[in-house]
């Protein structure tokens, strides 16, 4: 990776502004974008635990508690009676109704929840609840990525690309001034060839 990065940066830092170098710029730019994408994907897999041994355990659902045992049928009933009600509003209503129940009314659902938890322990003896991390949003640019070699290369390539364009513009103007400085002064006695040559350089 370092040798490839050095090769890319050497091209951008070179003083050669030949057409061959300019043609290589889009290809190098695509390569740097690929490296940034691969870097983010690797980081995302490490954080979310994808393709790991723990991913199977993370997919195991937690056993329902007493409230979920009770609200399982109540939610379905309320949704049928109020088809336009949002799920968040239904959850608020169910939470309020659950608080209004007495301990005696809640007791059967606590017993059912204990049975479900016992069955869950027998089926998954090594289960341990692990809250999932919220997935990070894809950064808009590579500057938000971690400081690994690929992300550092991406930011350096973008910076050197801007410097390359600025240097190309300066070099072009410098060459034009140099050429114009060696042209003979134009006057009424100048030949048509000299006038055409002067007109060509001033239009660049």
UniProtKB/Swiss-Prot annotation:
Cited InterPro entries: HMG_box_dom, HMG_box_dom_sf, SRY, SRY-related_HMG-box_TF-like
Residue ranges of the annotated DNA-binding region, renumbered to this chain: 60-128
Composition-biased stretches (Basic and acidic residues): 194-204
Cellular localization per UniProt: Nucleus speckle; Cytoplasm; Nucleus
Gene Ontology molecular-function annotations: calmodulin binding; DNA-binding transcription activator activity, RNA polymerase II-specific; DNA-binding transcription factor binding; RNA polymerase II cis-regulatory region sequence-specific DNA binding
SUPFAM superfamilies: HMG-box
Region (Disordered): 175-204
Key word Transferase present: no
GO cellular component, one term: cytoplasm
GO BP: cell differentiation; male sex determination; positive regulation of gene expression; positive regulation of male gonad development; positive regulation of transcription by RNA polymerase II; sex differentiation
Signal peptide region: none
Keywords for the protein's UniProt record, in alphabetical order: Activator, Calmodulin-binding, Cytoplasm, Differentiation, DNA-binding, Nucleus, Sexual differentiation, Transcription, Transcription regulation
Disulphide linkage map: none
Annotated function: Transcriptional regulator that controls a genetic switch in male development. It is necessary and sufficient for initiating male sex determination by directing the development of supporting cell precursors (pre-Sertoli cells) as Sertoli rather than granulosa cells. Involved in different aspects of gene regulation including promoter activation or repression. Binds to the DNA consensus sequence 5'-[AT]AACAA[AT]-3'. SRY HMG box recognizes DNA by partial intercalation in the minor groove and promotes DNA bending. Also involved in pre-mRNA splicing.
Subunit relationships: Interacts with CALM, EP300, HDAC3, KPNB1, ZNF208 isoform KRAB-O, PARP1, SLC9A3R2 and WT1. The interaction with EP300 modulates its DNA-binding activity. The interaction with KPNB1 is sensitive to dissociation by Ran in the GTP-bound form. Interaction with PARP1 impaired its DNA-binding activity.
Similarity field: Belongs to the SRY family.
Protein name (record): Sex-determining region Y protein
Source organism of this protein record: Pan troglodytes (Chimpanzee)
